[in-house]
Every structure is written in structure tokens, then in C-alpha cells.
UniProtKB/Swiss-Prot annotation:
Quaternary structure note: Interacts with atp1b1 C-terminus.
Descriptive protein name: Sodium/potassium-transporting ATPase subunit beta-1-interacting protein 4
Similarity remark: Belongs to the NKAIN family.
Gene that specifies this protein: nkain4
Transmembrane segments: 10-30, 35-55, 62-82, 151-171
One Pfam family recorded for the sequence: NKAIN
């Protein structure tokens, strides 16, 4: 079957999602954001599964991808709420790092136009250096960069969900029509062989 519009579009969407997820994974690793790192890893795995299912006409894999797309949208909505401090959420907390470290988003110190300055702490001596870090001159605050990342992920996931449902319905209809004409039904072949054997036995039993 030629590559239909819906199937080709889903392949393109899965590819774009992989590129966006890998880009995001790199910066989450740099910021030690363990929660997003784990979520990105699962997203990459399931997206590859969905891409494989689309290429190999496996509707179950595409369905699994569609279910994950809905979960992925929910996760990114949470991230938007987190960075915009909706309700009791605080973007300065270490929630996304699983309270393992005090690291924040990598963009908080390395965003566009940001200048990072370190001031040593007075009266603190030791082998480890201690300093206050201040960031000034950022063209875009880091929370808005993270929100834009999540918004892009939501857009791609919603489109992927819609096309995954469409492609699944197309695959299912094709399987049903193939079953209807006996494509996967072993009975016709068995029936022909049984009839041939019956005729052979009948011929050998005739008197000479």
C-alpha cells in the first residue's frame, strides 16, 4: 500500500517529537532535572514504538502511542503550571529533581542574554569554594522558555494523538476487509486440500 497522507503525517510527527524530546533531554540533563529526564526517556521509547507501529502496520503499537500522547499532554500541562506557579506550586523548589539536589532549569543561568556572576561568601573558608550566583540581563526568563518547550510538546502530542487514532482506524478497516476476503482465514486452503483428498480416495476405490 502506498504511503497515505495520514500515515506519512504521523511518521513526520513522530520524527519531530523525537527531535524535540532529545533536545529537551539534553538540557534537562544539564540541569539535573531527574523527573523530566525520566519522563523524556519514556516519551522517546514510546514514540519510537509508535513510529515502528506506523511503519510496520501494527495498530496495537499505534494505540499504545496514542494513549501515551494523552499522558504526555497531561505531564506538560503540569510543567506549565509548575513554572507559572499555579496554585501552591513553586518554580524555585527542587520538586523536579526529586529533592536530590537544589538544581533548577539549565535555562535559569544560561538563557538568552543572561550574564552569570559569582560573588564569594565572606567568612567561609575550606576546600570547597562557596559563592552566591546572580544572573542578570536575561532577555527571556527561564520559566517562559520552559513553558514554550512544554507548549510545543503539547501541540505535537495532540496532533500525534489525532493522527494515531485515524491511522489505527485505517489499519483496522484494512485488516477487517482482508479477513473478509479470506486473507487470514486458513479454511479455504484446508477445504481445498480436504476435497482433493476425498476425490483421490474415491477414484482409488472404484472397481477396475
Amino acid at each position: 500500500m502506498a504511503c497515505c497522507t495520514g500515515r506519512c503525517t504521523l511518521i513526520l510527527l513522530c520524527t519531530l517529537q523525537l527531535v524535540a524530546a532529545l533536545e529537551r533531554q539534553v538540557f534537562d540533563f544539564l540541569g539535573y532535572q531527574w523527573g523530566p529526564i525520566l519522563a523524556n526517556f519514556l516519551h522517546i521509547v514510546v514514540t519510537i514504538l509508535g513510529l515502528f507501529g506506523t511503519l510496520q502496520y501494527r495498530p496495537r503499537y499505534v494505540i499504545a502511542y496514542a494513549i501515551w500522547a494523552a499522558i504526555w499532554v497531561t505531564w506538560n500541562v503540569f510543567l506549565i503550571c509548575f513554572y507559572l506557579e499555579v496554585g501552591d506550586l513553586n518554580k524555585e523548589s527542587d520538586l523536579l529533581s526529586f529533592h536530590v539536589s537544589q538544581h533548577q532549569s539549565w535555562w535559569s543561568e544560561h538563557g538568552p542574554g543572561c550574564v552569570r556572576k559569582e560573588a564569594p561568601v565572606a567568612g567561609v573558608a575550606g576546600l570547597e569554594s562557596h559563592s552566591y550566583v546572580s544572573v542578570i540581563g536575561c532577555s527571556v526568563e527561564y520559566q517562559y522558555i520552559e513553558v514554550m518547550h512544554s507548549a510545543l510538546q503539547i501541540l505535537l502530542a495532540l496532533l500525534g494523538f489525532v493522527y494515531a487514532c485515524y491511522v489505527t482506524s485505517v489499519f483496522t478497516e484494512e485488516e477487517d476487509s482482508f479477513d473478509f476476503i479470506g486473507g487470514f482465514d486458513p479454511f479455504p486452503l484446508y477445504h481445498v486440500n480436504e476435497k482433493s483428498n476425498h476425490l483421490l480416495v474415491k477414484q482409488t476405490s472404484l472397481p477396475a
